[in-house]
Amino acid sequence: MSLISRLKAVVAGDEYLDDDFDELDYATEDELNDINDFKQTQRNSNALANSNPFDFMNNNRSSKVVGMPGISNSSSEVSLMEPRSFDEMPQAIQALRERKTVILNLTMMDPDQAQRAVDFIAGGTYAIDGHQERVGESIFLFAPSCVNVTSSSPEEASPSSVSPKNTPQYSVENNTAPEPAWGNSKLSAFS
């Protein structure tokens, strides 16, 4: 049927689509029963295959084993990378995405490329809510969010120990309290 003849049939109100429908085949009750029996057989065979042969010993007792917090069944993996160019950085990001800790030794790279690499990995680490830590000169630790990173010296980990290069540094030698605002503390109003 062409487009023009269909349009004419629609305007005239003819039953123009009767020829295009196929009869739907509905499953009979016997076929539905056969399908359900097959599914039940599959479930039973899967349950038997997955069952533990030692389950008969544990039927009468309840398990009192409690997992320790912070310890997972999967082993943690650390990836040590010593890249020579920036082209190797996507491998470090992939390792972080696979929930592996990455130690990046950038001593073999040009300083400009190393800075670019650290910025790239730091961005990827931030995107997955991970942690980053400078371990040594040109050595960095990047960890996914599932790994807690702690520092043995609190001074290194504190954000106050890191300051911009152009900011003047102030040190306070005297730890005594400042003088009160009303004047000399040695003088009293009643003397």
UniProtKB/Swiss-Prot annotation:
Presence of the UniProt keyword Cell division in the record: yes
Subunit structure: Homodimer. Interacts with FtsZ.
The family this protein is said to belong to: Belongs to the SepF family.
Subcellular location field: Cytoplasm
Function text: Cell division protein that is part of the divisome complex and is recruited early to the Z-ring. Probably stimulates Z-ring formation, perhaps through the cross-linking of FtsZ protofilaments. Its function overlaps with FtsA.
Identification of the protein by name: Cell division protein SepF
Keywords for this protein: Cell cycle, Cell division, Cytoplasm, Septation
Region (Disordered): 150-191
PANTHER family, sorted: CELL DIVISION PROTEIN SEPF
Gene for this chain: sepF
Organism: Prochlorococcus marinus (strain MIT 9312)
Claim: Lipid metabolism is one of the keywords in the record: no
Biological processes per GO annotation: division septum assembly; FtsZ-dependent cytokinesis
Gene3D superfamilies with a match to the protein in the record: SepF-like protein
